[in-house]
Amino acid sequence: MKQETIDRIRKFTEDRDWDQFHTPANLAKSISIEANELLECFQWSDTEYDISHVKEELADVLVYCRNMLDKLELDEDEIVNEKMSRNEAKYPVEKAKGDRKSVV
């Protein structure tokens, strides 16, 4: 995420004094709620969906994830790369390529 966007999210939260409500537990709940709203976009069809609604719900998920990263003082690149390293070890290409059972 671009620094300008991160700063905008932080300012939005700060201007409203909402950080006091952003406990890790509350943020995790909010991420889950918004992820389910994203899932709702695909409730009745795997192929037909309203992209503007998908974008809105996906943005909500990302904003709450960004807030959690800040709250826990985590670096998104660092934690994603750590997880990708574990996934690469767990699902080597030669064993997992094209194997539906090993889809992460």
Indicate residue ranges for each PLM-predicted region.
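Flexible "arm" and connector segments at domain edges
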Residues: M1-V104
